[in-house]
Amino acid sequence: MSSEDSLKSLSLDYLNLLINGQAFSDVAFSVEGRLVHAHRCVLAARSLFFRKLFCGLDPNHQPPPPPPPPLNWPTAGGGGGGSGGGGRGGAGGGGGAPATPELVIPVSSIRYEVLVLVLQFLYSGQASVAAPKSGPLPGCGARGCWHTRCGAAVDLALDTLAAARSFGVEQLALLVQKQLESMVKEASVDDVMKVLMASRKFEMQELWATCSHLVARSGLSADLLAKHLPIDVVAKIEEIRAKSPLAAAAAPRSPFLTHHYLPMNPASSAADRDNKIRRMRRALDAADIELVKLMVMGEGLDLDDALAVHYAVQHCNRDVVKALLELGAADVNSRAGPTGKTALHLAAEMVSPDMVSVLLDHHADPNSRTLDGVTPLDVLRSLTSEFLFKGAVPGLTHIEPNKLRLCLELVQSAVMVTTRDDGAPVTGGEAGGSDGGNFPRSDADDSLVSLTMNSTLMYQGQEMAAAVAAGEGRKSNNGRGSPPPAMYFPNGFA
């Protein structure tokens, strides 16, 4: 066996001691409700931090007494038989050393995965800083992610780097630095900036140089960088840009068209697009509009191609949609799906007054039509008709009638305003004149007021029907059904 093989075997033996060392451990670390068993002699020999820690424990803590001699072990006094009997009694009949209480040290400054990585390196001299591929990693919700450049993998590496510096394990810190240098080349801009600040804190010049050049090439403006980085760091990045041959090419570009001058790999463009969309959706779910802005300006994310507004309307709250639209990088009237629905169509189908109002406030077109010619008003009119004739919408029992009425009024008002602004007369009997504007009055437009009256009667009728149904429920069932809903709508669609 060569010396290299011997060292590998020794490293593996020590690693197995850590993995299966509960029976022989004399110290345990309590982290995140889990115990990690270890051995003070190994940790003290490998790390000055642990040596000082174990030497500076509570003075009331006394080291465990030496174990009694094993069975039949020759002693200076000779009496082998007597010691043997005492050995059995002291060991409880097991013939071994009496168990000593294990020292438990609570740990709150680092997480479980980081502590395990540090201990693995201390025991074996080797550690894989990269997260397990395709396995679960806290902080990463993407299915099938290989954790080579995701934010969770970067955070794990940064936490391991900080722990290595705290424990005085410089070799592990260098190993993590090399890992980060390869990760940042494919990581997002916000992750690169996190690594940049960590390299500055720990004075890692090579990692600093790599990250600073990547941020300089990102195309983010100095004003935006100043919101996330110290002023002196922004100044150094601007100096790098001034010396870079890409500065002249990047200067006249729009902030929303960055990275277009960088080489693209067609083979990975589809995977990159899907990864960007997943990260954008996670940012929207977390209401992190700044991260979305960084992705737009630093990575060239197309919000319309990613259907950002549609996703936000369906899965986020009003404030997120409002902030997203105020970025100015998304078209509120962009279409999605095989029928070409706009975000306003989705808001109408959801019967969400909050979404309808915020979209209309940001100039959503109430007259936009799908490929089938359906407008948002048509969607609401159809839902209203279902309520008028059936009293409820099949599959949409969660819809509140008051919200439906409010959505209807909002869209109707927007249609009227749009029609008036486009030049269609709306006063007196001239509403149907032959010289109408771009949106001539039709039978649908003429029925807006009638539809409002009918919808108002609908809600009043539903309240009356509910009261009658409650009264009938208290009576005995005599076979007479409740009156049909149409009796409450004398001016309905009959």
From Swiss-Prot:
Q: Which GO terms describe its biological process?
A: induced systemic resistance, jasmonic acid mediated signaling pathway; plant organ development; regulation of DNA-templated transcription
**Which residues are listed for Zn(2+) binding in this entry?**
C140, C145, H147, C150
Keywords (alphabetical) are:
ANK repeat, Cytoplasm, Metal-binding, Nucleus, Repeat, Ubl conjugation pathway, Zinc, Zinc-finger
Q: Where is this region: Disordered?
A: 60-95, 421-443, 471-494
* Gene Ontology cellular-component annotations: cytoplasm; nucleus
What is the predominant subcellular site recorded for this chain? nucleus
Q: Report each ANK repeat as a residue range.
A: 275-303, 304-334, 339-368, 372-406
- Where are the compositionally biased (Pro residues) regions? 61-72
Chain ranges of zinc fingers (C2HC NPR-type): 137-151
Pathway the protein takes part in: Protein modification; protein ubiquitination
Localization in the cell: Nucleus; Cytoplasm
Pfam families per record: Ank_2 (PF12796), BTB (PF00651), DUF3420 (PF11900)
Which PROSITE patterns does the UniProt entry name for this protein? ANK_REP_REGION (PS50297), ANK_REPEAT (PS50088), BTB (PS50097), ZF_C2HC_NPR (PS52046)
Instruction: Indicate, by first and last residue, each region the UniProt record lists as having compositional bias (Gly residues).
Output: 76-95
Q: Does the keyword Repeat apply?
A: yes
GO terms assigned for molecular function: transcription cis-regulatory region binding; zinc ion binding
Q: Give the domain of life.
A: Eukaryota
The BTB domain is annotated at 25-131
Q: Which family does it belong to?
A: Belongs to the plant 'ANKYRIN-BTB/POZ' family. 'NOOT-BOP-COCH-like' (NBCL) subfamily.
Oligomer status and interactors = Homodimer. Interacts with TGAL5, TGAL7, TGAL8 and TGAL9.
Q: Which PANTHER family does the protein's record reference? A: BTB/POZ DOMAIN AND ANKYRIN REPEAT-CONTAINING PROTEIN NH5.2, BTB_POZ DOMAIN AND ANKYRIN REPEAT-CONTAINING PROTEIN NH5.1
| Protein role | May act as a substrate-specific adapter of an E3 ubiquitin-protein ligase complex (CUL3-RBX1-BTB) which mediates the ubiquitination and subsequent proteasomal degradation of target proteins. Transcriptional co-regulator involved in the promotion of leaf and floral meristem fate and determinacy. Required for the abscission of senescent organs, probably by regulating the cell wall disorganization in abscission zones (AZs, e.g. pulvini at the base of leaves).
Q: What is known of its domains?
A: The BTB/POZ domain mediates the interaction with some component of ubiquitin ligase complexes.
List the protein's name.
BTB/POZ domain and ankyrin repeat-containing protein NH5.2
